[in-house]
Amino acid sequence: MRFIPTRYHAPLDYIVGVVLIAAPWIFQFSDNSGPTVVSIVLGAGLIAYSLITDYELGVWKIAPMAVHNLIDIVAGAFLAASPWIFDFADDGAKVWAPFLVVGAAAIFLGLTTKQTGGYRYRKGGAHPTAAAG
C-alpha cells in the first residue's frame, strides 16, 4: 500500500543524499576507501535522479515517480548489501550500519511512496480519480 505523499519523499531524497555524501566523515570511516566511495557515489546519484524526477522538488521533471521509486528500491538493496559486496562488513557497526539502515529505509520509501501526486496536480493536470468520479 502506497501511503507516503511525494511532498514528504522529495525533501528526504536531498537530505539523505547529502548525509550519504557526508557519512564517511560523520561516522568516521573516511580512511576506508570502499565504503567511502560507495557512500559518496550513491549519495550523488540520489541527488542526481531526484533532480530529474517529476515531483515537487524535481528541477527538470523528466523521470516519472514510478521510475524514481524503482530506483530507490534497487539502490536501497545495493546500499544495504554493499558491506558484504565490497567486503567491509567486518569493519565494525559504525561502518556497515549506516549502509544497512539507509538501504532499508530507501527500500521502504520506494515501496510505500505514492506513484503520482504533488507537482503535476497543483499545476492544473487532471487528478487520476477525477476522471473516474
Q: What annotation goes with each model-predicted range?
A:
Residues 16-36:
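Membrane-helix boundary elements
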Residues 81-98:
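Membrane-helix boundary connector in multi-pass membrane proteins
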Residues 1-7, 30-34, 56-66, 90-93:
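Juxtamembrane loop-transmembrane helix junctions in multi-pass integral membrane proteins
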Residues 1-11, 116-133:
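Intrinsic N-terminal pre-sequences and regulatory tails
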Residues 35-68, 108, 112-121:
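A low-complexity, Ser/Thr/Gly/Pro-enriched, surface-exposed linker/loop concept
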Residues 68-83:
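Hydrophobic alpha-helical membrane segments
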Residues 97-108:
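Small-residue-rich transmembrane alpha-helices that serve as helix-helix interface/gating elements
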